[in-house]
Amino acid sequence: MALEQIKGKLVVSCQALPHEPLHSSYIMSRMAVAAMEGGAAGIRAQSVPDINAIAEACHLPIIGIVKRNYDDSEIYITPTMKEVDELLTTRAEIIAMDATCRKRPGGIPVRDLVDRVHEAGRLAMADCSTFEECRVAQETGFDMVSTTMSGYTDYSPRLEGPDFDLIRRCAEELAVPVIAEGKIHYPEDLKKAFECGAFSAVVGGAITRPQEITARFVKILG
């Protein structure tokens, strides 16, 4: 089972959007293989082509998302049933989606998306920004919650690093697994996330976005 495979372990997010230098399904598949060889237990990936390429290249469980913008909503991570259905054509064992309290495109209830995921025999992951959103996600039927959106909504704290308080509170008060994700820049951040009670953790930019890694080094030079 995908959840057991990532328990206590690192998931690496391999994503590059069209405006980024490494945008290529082939490159993302090689990035996933490199992550697997480094000891990653799972991969988080964006778009059907990337997920399919990664699934062919490595055997790790995949957390799948589709990022798409809509005019009537700020939500862009697996926002509608269209994106869910696209992901269900892939091998992604876990389907992640924005579960913030913001209005979804078309006003579709997030519960409908979760139900579709479960009907297909997959797991649903809630990308949240606050404890209340994580609590509601658990009640809605999500199989796990993540702290992905903390700092990316108008009403969540703006932090330089991970939202450790959110990770800790979710781990203490919720029954579903808590996935630490967002601004995990250093190995020490990862260690602390697990000390706060994270079930698993996702690291992206610090591993797979060379432009961000380079900028972090350049910043030190002033």
Regions found by a protein language model. Give the residues of each.
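Active-site-adjacent beta->alpha loops and helix N-cap segments on the catalytic face
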Residues: 21-25, 44-63, 74-82, 99-117, ...
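Conserved N-terminal beta1-alpha1 strand-loop-helix module at the mouth
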Residues: 1-89, 124, 132-140, 144, ...
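Glycine-enriched alpha-helix->loop->beta-strand junction motifs that scaffold or abut catalytic
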Residues: 39, 58-62, 90-94, 119-121, ...
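Conserved hydrophobic beta-strand within the GNAT/NAT acetyltransferase core sheet
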Residues: 97, 124-126, 178-181
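Solvent-exposed alpha-helices and their adjacent loops that cap or buttress functional pockets
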Residues: 1-5, 88-89, 116-118, 169-173, ...
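Glycine-rich phosphate-binding active-site loops on the catalytic face of alpha/beta enzymes
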Residues: 15-17, 66-70, 90-104, 144-157, ...
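Glycine-rich beta-strand-to-loop/alpha-helix junction loops that act as flexible
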Residues: 179-184, 202-206
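A C-terminal functional module that forms or caps the active site or interfaces directly
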Residues: 165, 173, 177-178
